[in-house]
Amino acid sequence: MAEMKQQIEAAVECTHKAWIPVFKQLGYPTHSLPINYYEGGTATTPCGTLQAPAVYCSANGGSLYFGSRLLRENSTSVIWIKLMVFHEYGHHIQAQSKLFNAKAKLPSGNETERRMEIQAECYATGMIRSDDSFALTEKNYQVLRKALQSFIDDGIHGSPESLLYWGMRGFHSESIGGCNTWVVGSEKVR
């Protein structure tokens, strides 16, 4: 478990350093995000008590939470760990760019939440492509595709088909704009 925590912390630090110039240019705060670990499947955060393997909380400038169950179940996959870290960091990008505020003005419901979650996953795969810390071989590419299709469709995080579509879109996109889930029809964010 200590090795997984090191991987998480290294991935968060590297990702944050990569985003600092963008945040500075846009006038966003650049402070480091606190990383928290919790036992079981429930995180207690300033945003409330949430049941999830990993959580981003936007309160107080943002913080990341990773559950012990996530670390034990996925301890053999570097790609899985990075996908989770980058997904949660994707929510930080959304919070920084005020997408959380804009979302609050939209009708509540699963589709609005799905657009947010699928966009974070799209960001995550773009960050994986840009991550030079491990080789993106054909084997790793297939592991990534399989990981995207392995999520259980809970109505909020997207169907395996949508996650694969947006995940590959983010992976192959030249810019973060390729992850704009807010301008497509409902059929693209199932």
Where in the sequence are the language-model features?
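Long, well-structured alpha-helical subdomains associated
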Residues: R129-R190
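Catalytic zinc-binding patch centered on the HExxH motif and its immediate surroundings
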Residues: Y38-Y65
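Short pre-active-site segment immediately N-terminal to the catalytic Zn-binding motif
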Residues: S68-V85, N110-T112
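A metal-dependent hydrolase signature that marks the N-terminal structural subdomain at the beginning
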Residues: M1-T44, G177-R190
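Surface-exposed patches in mature extracellular/periplasmic domains of secreted proteins
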Residues: I20-N36, A102-K103, D131-L144
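Catalytic Zn2+-binding segment of zinc metalloproteases
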Residues: Y89-K105, R129-D132
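Post-HExxH zinc-binding segment in Zn-dependent metallohydrolases
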Residues: G109-L136
